[in-house]
Amino acid sequence: MSSPQTTTELAAVADALRSHDRFLLITHENPDGDALGSILAAKLMLDALGKNSVMYLSGAAPLPAEYKFMSLDGLRRQLPDDVAERVLFALDCANESRLGEGQAALEPAPVVVNVDHHHDNSRFGDVNLVVADASSTGEIVRDLVRELGLALTPELAEALYVALVTDTGRFQYANTTPKALRLAAELVETGADVHRVFQSVYETVQLAKLKLLARALDRAQVYEGGGLVVSYLLKTDFAEVGAAEPYSEGIIDFLRAVEGAELAALIREPPAPGRPARRVSLRSSSDELDVSAIARASGDGGGHRQAAGFSSELEIPQIVDFLREQYLQARAVARA
């Protein structure tokens, strides 16, 4: 985070946080560890500044069970009545659509602050801090804490550690930079409980989630000589095994681990009524294959080079055809 643009943006966000008193913290629907860790860390950061802030999450899906150990009791599922009086502070949201029902707060909010690490971020904020080479949004929040002259606390460190460890895949993904590892050491030294985080996030598995995983693995198919692995989950699967949509998180990592796979895709039908009809998660095993470009080609998606997703109204066979075509194009670009 040493580029002149990043330094300028960091200072601008810090100034916006200092100069306002009331905030609405928001992250993307179907949140992952980076989203939840970042929003909690931002809440603790604003508390330390003496600010009034509330956390909000769009959608009706329950929080993933693995994150219930976090201090998220104050997380609201309905927008507060005083939205027009609060700065909208968006974290880990690549674009407005990722806010879900929270998009309704964009217009009345006096100021929109956008902090994110997705390289295709639409920069929808009045004040933007987008650092594409950051390992996680949590890493950027740590730099904000430093810019504001605040000290790390064990609670803040643990929230940031959750963001960091999950978005780097337990420090295995290509975004595990030297800075990310130095940050991990700092957070542990400050008091982040590594064992508690590991047990909660990675060893808390509901039986329904295992049954959902079994169905996805049973349906997995390989295409294009084994370079593309695709599976799917139906709305009825969630109902029959008693699973909520967040239970599907992490399944795609098993698909990506298939020998020879360059691109993995999990198509799922959200169990809740309404749109979209289907969501698709994408993962690549190499930084050479940009899955965010595939997600954008769908017309309703985006993300990182190695982890992205999109929504679709197409039927599953049509989505598979789209993925096969896009995979071949992406592979040709990568090998050109």
Regions found by a protein language model. Name each.
Residues S2-E29, G37-A65, A84-E85, T166-S298, ...:
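Hydrophobic helix-and-loop "lid/oligomerization" segment in the mid-to-C-terminal part
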Residues A16-L17, P80-V83, A104-E107, N121-S122, ...:
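Solvent-exposed alpha-helices and their adjacent loops that cap or buttress functional pockets
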Residues N30-P31, C93-E96, H118-D120, K235-T236, ...:
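Short glycine-rich anion-binding loops that position phosphate/pyrophosphate groups of nucleotides
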Residues S38-A41, F69-S71, G102-L106, V127-V130, ...:
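Short, glycine/charged-enriched secondary-structure capping and boundary segments
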Residues L57-S58, P62-L79:
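Active-site donor-binding segments of glycosyltransferases and PAPS-dependent sulfotransferases
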Residues S71-V127:
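Active-site cofactor/cluster-binding pocket
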Residues V115-A184:
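Short alpha-helices
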